[in-house]
From Swiss-Prot:
Coiled coil, from the record: none
Role noted for this protein: Required for rescue of stalled ribosomes mediated by trans-translation. Binds to transfer-messenger RNA (tmRNA), required for stable association of tmRNA with ribosomes. tmRNA and SmpB together mimic tRNA shape, replacing the anticodon stem-loop with SmpB. tmRNA is encoded by the ssrA gene; the 2 termini fold to resemble tRNA(Ala) and it encodes a 'tag peptide', a short internal open reading frame. During trans-translation Ala-aminoacylated tmRNA acts like a tRNA, entering the A-site of stalled ribosomes, displacing the stalled mRNA.
Pfam families: SmpB
Name of the protein: SsrA-binding protein
GO molecular function terms listed in the Swiss-Prot or TrEMBL record: RNA binding
Intrachain S-S bonds: none
Amino acid sequence: MTKPIAENRRARYDYFIEETMEAGLMLTGTEVKSLRVGRANIAESYASVEGRTIKLINADIPPYGHANRFNHEPRRHRTLLLHRKQIDKLIGAVQRDGRTLIPLKLYWNEKGLAKLEIGLAKGKKNHDKRETEAARDWQRDKARLMKGDRGD
């Protein structure tokens, strides 16, 4: 996996990520060109079940600068490309267990194809977020203390 095009850093703060999966994206030519330039935002996006497919909603891929009037719509719904068993598993988890599908990372794979890492997630309550923050602060303080002990 190469350097990410876009990353949803807030997802791990707001959700418990239970499982991750790699999905392809059905994109138009100008969307691919815009991604090659490195322009995308998946911070406010989510994946939703529409019939027997899963769509990426609210992901922002800005219009390609050198395109003509046939440019794409920036926030259109994009179909995720997954195997049927994966789709059925995700649909079951979303409908039965009340889970959410959150995009975590958008990147190019080794073959040069745009891939999206999606997470099957459960929402965190406010007290869970505080616990996560406290644990992160403790890890940071512990690392500082250990660093201070090395120099003596």
